């Protein structure tokens, strides 16, 4: 799906790549749309597990955020078509896209609430934490260009990580 995009991926292509008969496809999915609707949420859960495992090694909010940020980009190296799947989903699998956004939003909200409860960040209301959540989510999307500028799938440059972390540290610690 990631190679060709949602529009150009057929059931024939999917089954050929998976090495299964088309009938087998229908044992697992009701339709082409069904697989489109399941793809992003499943991949999103894998991404959150990967990022969470990376972030869990940190002791503070800022350490966990840096490790999670780096973990997100290491996930992209494993799944280079993730951004294409994510960016095409609003048009081809809008329910899946909304489910994915909600899953990521809830994860970040939990992370930020816990940090606020532990005194690591101050001065943010619940509504403001939601804004922060979307800012952090968007940063990953747009800073991804530094890992794939020339169409390759590179590591995120360290200076980008440092700039991101500086913004997060100064933005969240002052309140």
Give residue ranges: language-model regions.
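Helix-turn-helix
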Residues: 2-34, 38
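Short coil/turn segments at alpha/beta junctions that flank glycine-rich nucleotide-binding fingerprints
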Residues: 3-7, 58, 79, 118
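Short, basic, alpha-helical segments at the C-terminal edge of helix-turn-helix-like DNA-binding modules
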Residues: 11, 41-48
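Alpha-helical elements of Rossmann-like donor-binding domains used by nucleotide-donor carbohydrate transfer enzymes
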Residues: 13, 34, 38, 67, ...
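Hydrophobic alpha-helical connector segments
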Residues: 38, 49-78, 132-136
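Amphipathic alpha-helical packing segments from all-alpha helical-bundle domains
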Residues: 45-48, 75, 94-120, 129-137, ...
């Amino acid at each position: 799906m990631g190679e060709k995009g949602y529009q150009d991926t057929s059931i024939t292509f999917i089954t050929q790549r998976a090495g299964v008969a088309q009938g087998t496809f229908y044992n697992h999915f009701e339709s082409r749309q069904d697989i489109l609707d399941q793809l992003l949420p499943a991949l999103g859960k894998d991404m959150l597990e990967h990022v969470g495992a990376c972030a869990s090694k940190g002791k503070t909010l800022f350490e966990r955020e840096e490790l999670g940020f780096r973990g997100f980009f290491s996930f992209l190296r494993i799944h280079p078509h993730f951004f294409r799947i994510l960016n095409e989903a609003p048009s081809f699998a809008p329910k899946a896209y909304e489910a994915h956004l909600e899953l990521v939003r809830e994860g970040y909200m939990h992370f930020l609430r816990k940090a606020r409860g532990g005194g690591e960040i101050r001065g943010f209301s619940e509504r403001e934490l939601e804004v922060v959540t979307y800012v952090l989510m968007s940063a990953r999307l747009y800073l991804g260009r530094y890992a794939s500028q020339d169409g390759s799938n590179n590591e995120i440059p360290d200076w980008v990580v440092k700039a991101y972390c500086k913004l997060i540290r100064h933005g969240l610690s002052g309140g």
